[in-house]
Amino acid sequence: MVGALELEERPQSLGEEIANSVSHGIGLLAALVAFPILVTAALQRGDLGGTVGASVFAITMVLLYLASTLFHALPACRAKRVFQILDHSAIYLLIAGTYTPFTLGVLRGAWGWTLFGLVWVLAVVGTVFKALGGVRYTTFSTWVYLAMGWLVLIAIEPVWTLVPKWGLFWLLAGGIAYTAGAVFFMAERIRYFHFVWHLFVVAGTACHFLAVLWYAV
């Protein structure tokens, strides 16, 4: 477990950590505001799948921004290392959480449950991998994040048919934002690239929030 609690290779400077924690702190506040909006909208519609999906998405959104904000805000200590692992693990959970309102509330049926099962199995495996292996193999984990995010392409036909076109637009925009941000995440040895990654994450989450709110609940 000592190896599992190693920090990332290049420690972030104080200025970088301030930018990192503030950026995702703002994301956390936005997620806390978005939570009741999503759940209320789903409850008003009265659909169980949509309500469960919106709740899961909202919870995983808050978890990611909370873990990230605390990790970057804390000074170097054991708690910081723990929150770094939670931060990386929460990415798996948010990806699966983003799928959930669409798989349970829109796709349903065989494709809905297949995608739901696949992404959540991958999320659980990824989380366990992070818990046991820590933040090593970051590049490998990033490719897994991207593969999970674009896994939806295996169900492109039913998704294209059942998700309204503007819903597809916001889903695609969010996916592109996350993917573009991953480039900066993998090149975070360059100063403030991790902060740029954070900005892309906030943008991607905002796009997916609109997709869920307007087209999945």
Label each residue range with its predicted role.
Residues 1-217:
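Multi-pass alpha-helical transmembrane bundles in non-GPCR membrane proteins
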